[in-house]
From Swiss-Prot:
This is Octanoyltransferase. One of its GO terms (biological process) is protein modification process. In the reaction, the free carboxyl group of octanoic acid is attached via an amide linkage to the epsilon-amino group of a specific lysine residue of lipoyl domains of lipoate-dependent enzymes. Residues 30-204 form the BPL/LPL catalytic domain. It comes from Nitrosomonas europaea (strain ATCC 19718 / CIP 103999 / KCTC 2705 / NBRC 14298). The lineage of its organism: Bacteria, Pseudomonadati, Pseudomonadota, Betaproteobacteria, Nitrosomonadales. Keywords: Acyltransferase, Cytoplasm, Transferase. PANTHER family: LIPOYLTRANSFERASE 2, MITOCHONDRIAL-RELATED, OCTANOYLTRANSFERASE. The gene is lipB. It is an enzyme of class 2 (transferase). HAMAP family: LipB (MF_00013). It is found in: Cytoplasm. Catalyzes the transfer of endogenously produced octanoic acid from octanoyl-acyl-carrier-protein onto the lipoyl domains of lipoate-dependent enzymes. Lipoyl-ACP can also act as a substrate although octanoyl-ACP is likely to be the physiological substrate. GO terms for molecular function: lipoyl(octanoyl) transferase activity. Substrate binds at R69, G70, G71, Q72, I73, T74, Y75, H76, S136, L137, G138, G149, I150, A151. GO terms for cellular component: cytoplasm.
Length: 204
């Protein structure tokens, strides 16, 4: 059985984390252990490789960074749990679609612990509660390994989402754990989310 190392990185600037992920992936070998990084970012919009500038509706003081993950624009900020997945997909015998389903499943299983019913959407990857998005997904695959991962809204200021079409969808509502009555702190939720993903990965 393969193991995954979980590292708590605290608050990390987006560019710093992104460069670290690229370096890790470029330097890894077939023997490099897989890692999950838990962190949060200072306020930042990130725009995926297919991102269209018009999805930033109201430019503001929050910086916009064009990144190498898939997808459109989203927001990261304090109170949002980031799970970066640095995995060898060959090791786990996963294709991208299977990995995305496991990412969604990790969030769905976590929320089910709090009696919150959530679901994925094959046409718009992510996790939703009553049509409102609580988790965004993004990935980059390089030489059979992935980076980027899951952004889970725990207890944050959701206002910056109103300045964008989240993930490129006009009028898409967003929600967070706090507004769903989940009182556990973000640190506990982050730990539980990481374990939930590992359970998905190992089919526990």
């Amino acid at each position: 059985m393969f193991t995954v190392t979980v590292k708590n990185m605290g608050t990390t600037e987006y560019l710093t984390a992104w460069q670290a992920m690229k370096n890790f992936t470029a330097q890894r070998t077939c023997e490099t252990p897989d890692e999950i990084w838990l962190l949060e970012h200072p306020p930042v919009y990130t725009q995926g490789i297919a991102g269209k500038p018009e999805h930033l509706l109201f430019p503001n003081q929050i910086p916009v960074i064009k990144t190498d993950r898939g997808g459109q624009i989203t927001y990261h900020g304090p109170g949002q749990i980031i799970l970066y997945l640095l995995l060898d997909l060959h090791r786990w015998r996963l294709n991208i679609r299977q990995l995305v389903r496991k990412m969604e499943g990790a969030v769905i299983d976590l929320l089910s612990e709090y009696d919150v019913v959530a679901q994925g959407d094959e046409n718009a990857p992510g996790v939703y509660v009553d049509g409102a998005k609580i988790a965004s997904l993004g990935l980059k695959i390089r030489r059979g390994a992935c980076y980027h991962g899951i952004a889970f809204n725990a207890d944050m200021d959701l206002t910056p989402f109103t300045a964008i079409n989240p993930c490129g969808y006009r009028g898409l509502r967003v929600t967070q754990a706090k507004d769903l009555g989940i009182a556990d702190c973000k640190e506990m939720l982050a730990t539980k989310l990481a374990q939930s993903f590992i359970n998905q990965l190992t089919d526990v």
